[in-house]
C-alpha cells in the first residue's frame, strides 16, 4: 500500500523535492530495486492482452519483465541491485489479511464479469486479484542468478533494506512505487523507474532532505505525518486527510502531542507507536559489516534452458538478449558494488 496520498501531498508542498529525470541520467549509478513491486508491475502490465503464458500455461510476464528490463538497464550502464522481501513484521499481518480478502472479492467479481462477457470489468478485476507468489519470487531469483545480476533478500521489508543501502551510500537511490521508502529514510526514491522504459515517462526522483526542508519537518515528524496519512502498519484516523494531517503535525510536532491536545476519534487498537518503531528502526535490522557484491558470470546455457526449454520463450530473442547483456558487461561500465550489508540470499 505504501503511504496514502503522500505523493499528492508532496507534489503540492515540496516542488523542489521532486525532479523529473530521463532514465539515461542513472547511467553509471547503482540503484536498489524493490523486487516485489517490480514483479507486481510486470504481472499486471500484460493483463489488457491476457497474461503471458509459458509451456504449461503458467504466467511468465514477471520473467519477461525481469529479463528484458534488466538487460535494458545494463545497456544504459545502470547497476540494478534487486531486493526481495524477507519476513514481514507481525504488525503488518492485519494489512496482509485485508489484501487477501480484497483479492478474493476481486476474483468473485472477475468470474461474474466473465460470465456476462464484460471484458473491461474482467481486465480491472484481473489486475486486482493478482498476487506475487513464492513461485514468482523463486523464478525471478533463479533468472537473476543465471544473468549474474546482484540481488539480496531483506531481513524483513524490502523497502527498509533498500533505504539502508541508500543511507549507507551503497546505491544512488531506491526504485519503487511505494512511498514508504522515504518514511524508512531513503535519501533518494525513484518512481516510474520501470514504467519509463515502455511508456516513455520520466523518472520521478524524490529527494528526502529537500522534502523535509520544504515541509519544515525533521524525519521523526515526517514519520508521524506518514502514519497519520495511512500506512501498512496501522489504520487511519477518521476525518484526517492530507491537508489536516500536515497541519496537525506542524502545529503539535508529534502524534503524541496531537492526541493530548486534539479531540480525535481514535480506535482502541491504533498501534501508532509500533508503526513509529518500525519506520525508525526496521531499516537498521541485520548485521552490518564491510561486504563486496560483485557481478556473477552469465550462464548462457542456463538461461536458455530455463527460459526456452522450460518456459517456452523464443530461442532467437533470448539469445539476442543474452548477447546484449554480455556486450554491455564487456564495456566495463558496471564495475563492482561495494556496500555495507550482509549477503542474505
UniProtKB/Swiss-Prot annotation:
Its cofactor is Mg(2+). DNA binds at residues 47, 69, 157, 230, 232. Structure-specific nuclease with 5'-flap endonuclease and 5'-3' exonuclease activities involved in DNA replication and repair. During DNA replication, cleaves the 5'-overhanging flap structure that is generated by displacement synthesis when DNA polymerase encounters the 5'-end of a downstream Okazaki fragment. It enters the flap from the 5'-end and then tracks to cleave the flap base, leaving a nick for ligation. Also involved in the long patch base excision repair (LP-BER) pathway, by cleaving within the apurinic/apyrimidinic (AP) site-terminated flap. The keyword DNA-binding does not apply. Keywords: DNA damage, DNA repair, DNA replication, Endonuclease, Exonuclease, Hydrolase, Magnesium, Metal-binding, Mitochondrion, Nuclease, Nucleus, Phosphoprotein. It comes from the Eukaryota. Coiled coil: none annotated. Belongs to the XPG/RAD2 endonuclease family. FEN1 subfamily. Residues 121-252 are annotated as: I-domain. InterPro entries: 5-3_exonuclease_C_sf, Flap_endonuc, HhH2, PIN-like_dom_sf, XPG-I_dom, XPG/Rad2, XPG_DNA_repair_N. This is Flap endonuclease 1. It is found in: Nucleus, Nucleolus; Nucleus, Nucleoplasm; Mitochondrion. Mg(2+) 2 binds at residues 178, 180, 232. Its main location: nucleus. The gene is FEN1. One of its GO terms (cellular component) is nucleolus. Pfam families: XPG_I, XPG_N. CDD domains: H3TH_FEN1-Euk, PIN_FEN1. One of its GO terms (molecular function) is 5'-flap endonuclease activity. Residues 1-103 are annotated as: N-domain. Mg(2+) 1 binds at residues 34, 85, 157, 159. Its EC number is 3.1.-.-. Residues 333-341 are annotated as: Interaction with PCNA. Phosphorylated. Phosphorylation upon DNA damage induces relocalization to the nuclear plasma. Interacts with PCNA. Three molecules of FEN1 bind to one PCNA trimer with each molecule binding to one PCNA monomer. PCNA stimulates the nuclease activity without altering cleavage specificity. Binds 2 magnesium ions per subunit. They probably participate in the reaction catalyzed by the enzyme. May bind an additional third magnesium ion after substrate binding. The keyword Metal-binding applies.
Amino acid at each position: 500500500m505504501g503511504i496514502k496520498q503522500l505523493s499528492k501531498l508532496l507534489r503540492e508542498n515540496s516542488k523542489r523535492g521532486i525532479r523529473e529525470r530521463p532514465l539515461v541520467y542513472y547511467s553509471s549509478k547503482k540503484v536498489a530495486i524493490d523486487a516485489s513491486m517490480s514483479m507486481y508491475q510486470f504481472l499486471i502490465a500484460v493483463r489488457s492482452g491476457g497474461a503471458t503464458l509459458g509451456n504449461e500455461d503458467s504466467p511468465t510476464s514477471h520473467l519477461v519483465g525481469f529479463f528484458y528490463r534488466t538487460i535494458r538497464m545494463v545497456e544504459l550502464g545502470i547497476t540494478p541491485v534487486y531486493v526481495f522481501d524477507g519476513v514481514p513484521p507481525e504488525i503488518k499481518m492485519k494489512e496482509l489479511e485485508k489484501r487477501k480478502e480484497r483479492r478474493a472479492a476481486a476474483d468473485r467479481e472477475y468470474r461474474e464479469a466473465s460470465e456476462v462477457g464484460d471484458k473491461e470489468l474482467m481486465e480491472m478485476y484481473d489486475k486486482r486479484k493478482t498476487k506475487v507468489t513464492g513461485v514468482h519470487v523463486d523464478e525471478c531469483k533463479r533468472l537473476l542468478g543465471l544473468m549474474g545480476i546482484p540481488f539480496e533478500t531483506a531481513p524483513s521489508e524490502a523497502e527498509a533494506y533498500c533505504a539502508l543501502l541508500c543511507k549507507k551510500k551503497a546505491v544512488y537511490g531506491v526504485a519503487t512505487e511505494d512511498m514508504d521508502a522515504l518514511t524508512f529514510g531513503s535519501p533518494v526514491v525513484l518512481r516510474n523507474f520501470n514504467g519509463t522504459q515502455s511508456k516513455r515517462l520520466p523518472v520521478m526522483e524524490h529527494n528526502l532532505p529537500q522534502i523535509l526542508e520544504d515541509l519544515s519537518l525533521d524525519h521523526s515528524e515526517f514519520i508521524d505525518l506518514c502514519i497519520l496519512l495511512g500506512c501498512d502498519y496501522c489504520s487511519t484516523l477518521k476525518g484526517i486527510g492530507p491537508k489536516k494531517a500536515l497541519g496537525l503535525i506542524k502545529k503539535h510536532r508529534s502524534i503524541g502531542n496531537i492526541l493530548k491536545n486534539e479531540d480525535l476519534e481514535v480506535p482502541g487498537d491504533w498501534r501508532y507507536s509500533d508503526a513509529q518503531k518500525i519506520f525508525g528502526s526496521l531499516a537498521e535490522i541485520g548485521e552490518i559489516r564491510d561486504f563486496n557484491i560483485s557481478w556473477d558470470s552469465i550462464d548462457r546455457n542456463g538461461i536458455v534452458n530455463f527460459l526456452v526449454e522450460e518456459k517456452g520463450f523464443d530461442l532467437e530473442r533470448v539469445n539476442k538478449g543474452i548477447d546484449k547483456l554480455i556486450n554491455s558487461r564487456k564495456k566495463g561500465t558496471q564495475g563492482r558494488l561495494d556496500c555495507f550489508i550482509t549477503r542474505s540470499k
